[in-house]
A protein has these predicted regions:
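Conserved N-terminal catalytic core of the sugar/cofactor nucleotidyltransferase
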Residues: 1-79, 85-91, 95
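Conserved core of the sugar-phosphate nucleotidyltransferase
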Residues: 85-171
């Protein structure tokens, strides 16, 4: 049997950062599944969300907890359901984002993927001005547009699929 998406995400991140620095935030009911799939991680690497309230509150709560552990941490938020087919390109993009965050400590970097088709089930990031190599300001976010707008976004060349991955520094 193959690796689950959670295990693949963990493996991918463990090639980028020390494994003991990977923190998994999950709803309380799923903690046992996380422990079953990743038996080698310690309990303090799992943040069990007390209330299921979607992504933003979960990320805010996890960021608060991580900041308490290390005020100078760089935080990478990533869903565990990503389908990453080019690991080398992913690692290069992560390193580029981390380098940018090191220079611009107040920045938040959202990772997007160039769309290959109109997909109304995905969120979109509209690219703004170029600020560093392959890093742009964000002009707009659009959450799950209808197919017509998704097609316009793809045709414009200004939009990326929102991966849900982003980087930020812990509050200093």
């Amino acid at each position: 049997m193959g690796r689950t998406q959670l295990q693949q995400t963990y493996d991918r991140l463990a090639r980028l950062v020390p494994a003991n620095r990977i923190i998994i935030s999950t709803y309380r009911e799923y903690v046992s599944i996380v422990k079953e799939q990743l038996p080698h991680i310690s309990d303090d690497q799992i943040l069990d969300e007390p209330i299921r309230k979607d992504t933003a509150p979960a990320v805010a709560w996890a960021a608060y907890r991580i900041t308490k552990l290390d005020k100078k941490a760089t935080i990478l938020v990533t869903p565990s359901d990503q389908d990453i087919r080019n690991e080398d390109a992913f690692r290069a993009n992560v390193h580029e984002a981390l380098s940018f965050i090191e220079k611009k400590k107040e920045a938040i970097v959202a990772m997007g993927v160039r769309p290959t088709r109109p997909e109304p089930g995905y969120g979109y990031i509209q690219r703004g001005d170029n600020v560093d190599h392959d890093i742009y300001t964000v002009k707009s976010f659009t959450e799950k547009p209808n197919r017509e707008f998704a097609q316009l976004f793809v045709d414009s060349g200004e939009f990326y699929w929102n991966t849900g991955m982003f980087f930020a520094r812990a509050k200093q």
